[in-house]
UniProtKB/Swiss-Prot annotation:
Molecular-function annotations in GO: mRNA binding; nucleotide binding; poly(G) binding; zinc ion binding
PPR repeat feature ranges: 5-39, 41-71, 72-106, 107-141, 142-172, 173-207, 208-242, 243-277, 278-308, 309-343, 344-374, 375-409, 412-442, 448-478
Example of a GO biological process term: regulation of catalytic activity
Region (Type E motif): 483-558
Pfam family name, one: DYW_deaminase
Annotated spans, Type DYW motif: 590-684
Alphabetic keyword roster: Nucleotide-binding, Repeat, RNA-binding
One GO CC term, this protein: mitochondrion
Signal peptide: none
Family: Belongs to the PPR family. PCMP-H subfamily.
Stated name of the protein: Pentatricopeptide repeat-containing protein At4g14850
Function: Acts as a regulatory factor of isoprenoid biosynthesis. Could bind RNA.
Positions of the UniProt region annotated as Type E(+) motif: 559-589
Length: 684
């Protein structure tokens, strides 16, 4: 070592950076101190400053700088660059201005580091000052300086300044165009990003993987399927179809555009996959409501030892929430704890949402309370959980903590959807109308179709069907399927067939192929005893070739899902299930229970109607749960359609008769049956 020259020592310091070896760096520094004159040559001092700052030892880097009498712009830039690279943005700016106090002029490498620090700290005024200095020093025309200044303006939300600077850059390179396109997407301006890409191609620009990914994000945000497919063709022609990041972008794009089969094909044909690839397809499945596939893929990724991220876990927790997969959700929660990501904002919010949608509101509250940091999504998730349970008082209490009344975040569009849904399910008409009116007057939020639908649903549940119709007629926007559907359901519940027919006609115009609309109208006529019209609607449904979606109920026992259909006799325990149901019916009839036959769909004799409703899928699932689950465990049933009136009455009676807690999640809300009472208070 004693024979090593200064150049060789400098090379060793570069190797220390490449190998991320602080030990090697310190050994070389010790050799420099021992063998060379003090202070070392300026270029060697600069190597030392660069090594310490890049390896995230800022104090050592600053000390070497202070002990170097002949420090120059390279010395300062080495320090500032390393500080910015390692996230010490405030310190980087302090050193930048200290350099200026010493009269050192920044160069083409110093300015980008300073702009990066300003962008990260969101300091627009400081950014403008440094921009002015770059102009004064004649550096702003450098493509790298100009690009970093442009990026700074974008990240500090100074759009006009960013656009002006972009137009003034004389020679835009690929990085400049990438910065423009990427920042336009990040800033919520996908159309501008697409227009920039088209202009870039017009001047014969050649995109790289960053360009392709940014453009795909723009197409995803704008849901522009055709344009994205054209880009996919360009990806193939340009040879980027083997690039992992581009393939990941394509998976995400097709998923958001509801082309999940295309996402699957790209994933399957990828030669090399990374953790983002798996995560992208899981998220795509969730976005397309294919929750079971998302869960299966997640379990496959665990077997393949794919690195787990907080985004992956939050995505699969959303899948568990969608299919009410409580057991799987709990196991993923345990994995999140093991991976030390359960308290991140993404995973924490997903846990709050998952437990709320699985009917475990206490677990949802606990996950919420244990989060060190909460944002608007977290609060909306808990309010949504309360809404599913019809706990309007708890939802309103959490809402009161938000701005402007409280110190929490300001409510947004989705906050009010959950609040109004809670009011609807609890029958809190007065509160619901006050909240709806406050959206514009207090919060400046324009109500959307979901909010109007909640109000119609709320009024309809409360029996104010005519008022709900008058509300629809006064809507400033065109009523949607959900609005007319809420009115039609209210007509079914309260025996208003003529108004129900009007709602159905509007539904048929908006979505003529949805079998649910025809079934609901048929039920409305059946509830009013107008059997001929009910059967006519059913026959029309068959005549146009529209098939009614099958109703399913399922229950999980010992990590195995058991699914049932109405009149299903295929289960291995069918004999025991039928015996249990018959026994329960006999006990209940002896106690005065009579089946609710008003919504039986056919003009049958009373005995036939009773047989019709006695084998609904949720009753079969309940009987199986009573046979299979211990007394201390609640019976949790999920149904893909709304629970019928007779099953609702049956479940209330059973919960009191056998002293079991029964939790049913249908396609509308949760029902917690206990001691003969339902949490919905018969509003559903």
């Amino acid at each position: 070592m004693s024979l090593l020259s200064a150049d060789a020592l400098g090379l060793l310091l570069k190797n220390a950076i490449s190998a991320s070896s602080m030990r090697l760096g310190r050994v070389v520094h010790a050799r420099i101190v021992k063998t060379l004159d003090s202070p070392p040559p300026p270029f060697l001092a600069n190597y030392l400053i660069n090594m310490y700052s890049k390896l995230d030892h800022p104090e050592s880097a600053r000390l070497v700088l202070r002990l170097t009498p002949a420090r120059n712009v390279v010395s300062w830039t080495s320090l500032i660059s390393g500080l910015a690279q390692n996230g010490h943005f405030s310190t980087a700016l302090v050193e930048f201005f200290e350099m200026r106090r010493e009269g050192v002029v920044p160069n083409d490498f110093t300015f980008p580091c300073a702009f990066k620090a300003v962008a990260s700290l969101r300091l627009p005024v400081t950014g403008k000052q440094i921009h002015a200095l770059a102009v004064k020093c004649g550096r702003i025309l450098d493509v790298f300086v100009g690009c970093s200044a442009f990026d700074m303006y974008c990240k500090t939300r100074l759009r006009d300044d960013a656009r002006k600077l972009f137009d003034e850059i004389p020679e835009r390179n690929l990085e400049t165009w990438n910065a423009f396109i990427s920042n336009s997407v990040t800033d919520g301006r996908p159309r501008e990003a697409i227009e920039a890409f088209i202009e870039f191609r017009r001047i014969d620009g050649h995109p790289n993987s960053i360009t392709f990914c940014a453009f795909l994000n723009a197409c995803s945000d704008w849901l522009h399927l055709n344009l994205g497919m054209q880009l996919h063709g360009l990806v193939l022609r340009s040879g980027f179809d083997t690039d992992v990041s581009v393939c990941n972008g394509l998976i995400d794009f097709y998923g958001k555009c509801k082309q999940i089969r295309s996402s699957e094909i790209i994933f399957t044909e990828m030669g090399t996959k990374n953790a983002v690839s798996w995560c992208s397809l899981v998220a795509a499945y969730v976005q397309n409501h294919e929750d079971e596939k998302a869960s299966v893929l997640y379990l496959r990724s665990r077997k393949d030892i794919v690195e787990t991220s907080d985004f992956m876990i939050s995505s699969v927790l959303s899948a568990c929430a969608g299919m009410a997969g409580l057991e799987l959700g709990r196991s993923i929660h345990a994995h999140a704890v093991k991976a030390c990501v359960e308290r991140t904002i993404f995973v924490g919010s997903a846990l709050v949402d998952m437990y709320g949608k699985c009917g475990c509101i206490e677990d949802s509250e606990q996950a919420f309370d244990e989060m060190p940091e909460k944002n608007l999504v977290t609060r909306n998730s808990l309010i949504g959980g309360y809404a599913h349970q019809g706990q309007v008082d708890m939802a309103l209490a959490l809402f009161e903590e938000m701005a402007p009344r409280g110190c929490g975040p300001t409510p947004n569009y989705m906050t009010f959807v959950s609040l109004l849904s809670a009011c609807s399910r609890a029958g809190a008409v007065e509160n619901g109308m006050k909240i709806f009116d406050s959206m514009r007057s207090t919060y400046g939020i324009e109500p959307g179709a979901e909010h109007y639908s909640c109000i119609v649903d709320m009024l309809g549940r409360a029996g104010m069907v005519e008022r709900a119709y008058e509300f629809i007629k006064k809507m400033p926007i065109q009523p949607t399927i959900s609005v007319w559907g809420a009115l039609q359901n209210a007509c079914r519940m309260h025996g208003k067939p003529q108004l129900g027919l009007l709602a159905a006609e509007n539904l048929f115009k908006l979505d003529p192929k949805d079998s649910g609309n025809h079934v609901l109208l048929s039920n409305t006529f059946a509830a009013a005893g107008r059997w001929a019209e009910a059967n006519t609607v059913r026959e029309e449904l068959k005549g146009v070739g529209i098939k009614k979606g099958a109703g399913y109920s399922w229950i999980t026992v010992k990590n195995q899902v058991h699914a049932f259909q109405a009149k299903d006799r295929s289960h291995i325990l069918n004999k025991e299930i039928q015996t249990t149901l018959a026994k329960l019916r006999n006990e209940m009839e002896a106690a005065g229970y009579k089946p609710d036959l008003k919504l039986s769909l056919y003009d049958l004799e009373e005995e036939e109607k009773a047989a019709e409703v006695s084998h609904h899928s949720e009753k079969l699932a309940l009987a199986f749960g009573l046979l299979s689950l211990p007394l201390s465990v609640p019976i949790r049933i999920t149904k893909n359609l709304r629970i019928c009136g007779d099953c609702h009455s049956f479940f209330k009676f059973v919960s009191g008769s056998v002293k079991r807690e029964i939790i049913v999640r249908d396609n509308n809300r949760f029902h917690r049956f206990k001691d003969g009472i339902c949490s919905c208070k018969d509003y559903w």
